[in-house]
């Protein structure tokens, strides 16, 4: 049977073997809220992995808006209705919509854990309602320091100590450095799930050419 005669469901099974499809069919077939969230996180991970390939490009311009706009642009190229700095209870960093479904992401460069907490609180108490059409959100954490695993573990411990109602966390099966947290949303009174996603942008090469470049920079 030729590819022209395959149904969307049949094509979806072939996505992993046909790079040109690039998850396109899964996005079309995502009818439920849970399907929308699952496919979105898969696509965000793909974008993150691509961004992590060249951390050296971000060392001189460490700006949250630039990093987040690039993610938004990639989501748009994938066909998502994505926007940056959208007015939803405030100026949300990243908003993705599909029909009545809304996913909101808050982005922070890791400076300290209180700074991440403020971003979490913006997502939790300012931007999201926690209603059934937006019961999930995300925290994008741009990490320029070393040892992302340690940063994420300490962030989870910090969050656990904040006495959120019915707080719980669990590790992400699809990405070991990410984790999910759940708690009772202040506004809706329902369970709100946040995916905490690190973006590894640490860059400190220690090969000979890198050391020479550092010496030359000091001399200059």
Stretches with model-predicted labels:
Residues 38-46, 50, 60, 64-68, ...:
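Localized chelating/binding microdomains
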Residues 142-220:
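Domain-level recognition of nuclease-like catalytic cores that cleave nucleotide substrates
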Residues 109-163:
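Catalytic cores of nucleic-acid endonucleases
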Residues 69-99:
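Active-site metal-binding core of divalent-cation-utilizing nuclease and nuclease-like domains
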Residues 94-96, 102-109:
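Conserved catalytic cores of phosphodiester-cleaving nucleases, focusing on short active-site segments
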Residues 99-100, 132:
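Short strand-connecting beta-turns/loops that link adjacent beta-strands
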Residues 1-65:
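Interdomain/boundary linker segments immediately adjacent to catalytic/signaling cores
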Residues 91, 102, 191-193:
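Short, mixed charged/polar active-site loops
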């Amino acid at each position: 049977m030729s590819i022209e005669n395959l149904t969307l469901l049949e094509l979806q099974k072939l996505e992993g073997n046909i790079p040109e499809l690039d998850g396109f069919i899964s996005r079309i077939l995502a009818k439920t809220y849970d399907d929308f969230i699952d496919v979105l996180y898969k696509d965000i991970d793909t974008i993150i992995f691509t961004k992590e390939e060249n951390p050296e490009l971000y060392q001189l311009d460490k700006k949250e808006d630039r990093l987040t706009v690039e993610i938004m642009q990639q989501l748009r190229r994938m066909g998502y209705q994505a926007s940056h700095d959208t007015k939803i209870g405030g100026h949300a960093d990243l908003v993705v919509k599909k029909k009545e479904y809304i996913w909101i992401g808050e982005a922070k460069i890791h400076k300290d854990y209180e700074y991440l907490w403020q971003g979490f609180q913006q997502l939790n108490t300012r931007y999201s309602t926690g209603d059934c059409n937006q019961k999930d959100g995300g925290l994008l954490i741009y990490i320029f320091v070393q040892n992302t695993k340690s940063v994420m573990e300490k962030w989870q411990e910090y969050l656990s100590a904040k006495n959120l109602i019915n707080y719980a966390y669990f590790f992400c099966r699809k990405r070991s450095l990410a984790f999910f947290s759940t708690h009772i949303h202040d506004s809706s009174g329902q369970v709100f799930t946040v995916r905490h996603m690190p973006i590894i942008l640490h860059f400190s090469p220690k090969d000979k050419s890198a050391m020479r470049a550092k010496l030359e920079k000091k001399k200059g």
